[in-house]
Amino acid sequence: MTTDTIVAQATAPGRGGVGIIRISGDKASNVAMAVLGHLPKTRYADYCDFKSASGQVIDQGIALFFKGPNSFTGEDVLELQGHGGQIVLDMLIKRVMEVGGIRIAKPGEFSEQAFMNDKLDLTQAEAIADLIDATCEQAAKSALQSLQGEFSKEVHELVDQVTNLRLYVEAAIDFPDEEVDFLSDGKIANALYKIIDKLDLVQASAKQGSIIREGMKVVIAGRPNAGKSSLLNALAGKESAIVTEIAGTTRDVLREHIHLDGMPLHIIDTAGLRDTTDTVEQIGIERAWNEINSADRVLFMVDGTTTAAVDPHAIWPDFVDRLPSNLGVTVIRNKADLTGEDLMMTEEQGYSVYRISAKTGLGVEELKQHLKSLMGYQSNLEGGFIARRRHLEALELAAGHLQLGKEQLEVYLAGELLAEELRMCQLALSEITGRFTSDDLLGKIFSSFCIGK
């Protein structure tokens, strides 16, 4: 592809020991001749002077030249590595611009060039930004896995399987004499079921990767005066919510964003759930349910002094029955300082149950470890791949088309409609890696990158 020659500072703005200027495009060699007086040997570090148009030395440092397509962007690339003073770097960029036909790079444009030149796919390009923005070791490991192609590999395997099945179905439709009763002999059904199972696994991994990157939304819910606001304060490490003995003190949604060992956690404190005629409180309860329905996890707060039950169905069946079927729930028996309960975690009917005292902090550290575990924190293991919300949406869309295709096969034996659903599934998956992606989406993704990346 033909691209502009672009330049940008690749290191962070400000004062530092080393500053790097990156140039990419067909005029990179012209810059080398103008600024260095010669073209460095490809892929070799060359210590030399960086000179102005009049021959004065601007700085001294190392020059690296990469001949396209054997470079990060796929274009000719020149890197000038000098001293990290911002004034010096600005002077050097100004000198590069004097060569002519060169412009300042837009945010993420070097990565965009690499994507357009097939040096990496879209998930790998996004992983560069995620690696830079990682807030914990787990996120960095996961981003690196994506950069190395782990996520792309999973998606490509799915695309290949869907494509092969689609071609088989279409061929059998076009040449019916070659395949008798091909829709009912079980071959297509078995292949389709395997793809659905594979996609389920990828979706689960992507959801975990998204939580590591974007954080987990945890909603604290329960009856009034169960200690929800006290737990919010204990997790946040500060007095974010007003705590009183008066039931219904919290009437609106309170939010805190914290990090557990660098992993982002979005905690939502909600109004106590109960039947009430108070209009303001009713609005707060409605907002509480809105937050619950969009949560990744619910901490069901129970006042341990009011019941000895641990099974949430026994504690409050109407509340549990109203929860989304796929929403994870952790039961928190609060006020252990008053009940004298042992601070231990138990499993009850598939629910994790923790005994704590939000007021004194007893058991809160164990609860934090539980939340870290839910977010995929692993202290000694390599991370899985990282994922973004758009990836989850594309996977969900692909899964929907597979389910529709399954219905066309099992209920209607409609080969043409099955093939169409497989085609739509293929398109949804290909959007993840950027094989079929709108220019608007590409612009949105790369514009969020750092300049110089």
Swiss-Prot record:
Q: What Enzyme Commission number does this protein have? A: 3.6.-.-
The entry's (6S)-5-formyl-5,6,7,8-tetrahydrofolate-binding residues are R22, E79, K119, K453
Similarity comment: family membership? Belongs to the TRAFAC class TrmE-Era-EngA-EngB-Septin-like GTPase superfamily. TrmE GTPase family.
How the cofactor is bound: the record states: Binds 1 potassium ion per subunit.
For this entry, the protein name equals tRNA modification GTPase MnmE
- What GO terms describe the biological role, i.e. biological process, of this protein? tRNA methylation; tRNA wobble uridine modification
The domain of life for this entry's organism is Bacteria
One GO cellular component assignment for this chain's record is: cytosol
Outline the extent of the TrmE-type G domain. 215-376
Q: Which organism is it from?
A: Shewanella baltica (strain OS155 / ATCC BAA-1091)
Q: Which NCBIfam families match?
A: mnmE_trmE_thdF, PRK05291.1-3, small_GTP
Is Cytoplasm a UniProt keyword of this protein? yes
A molecular function GO annotation: GTP binding
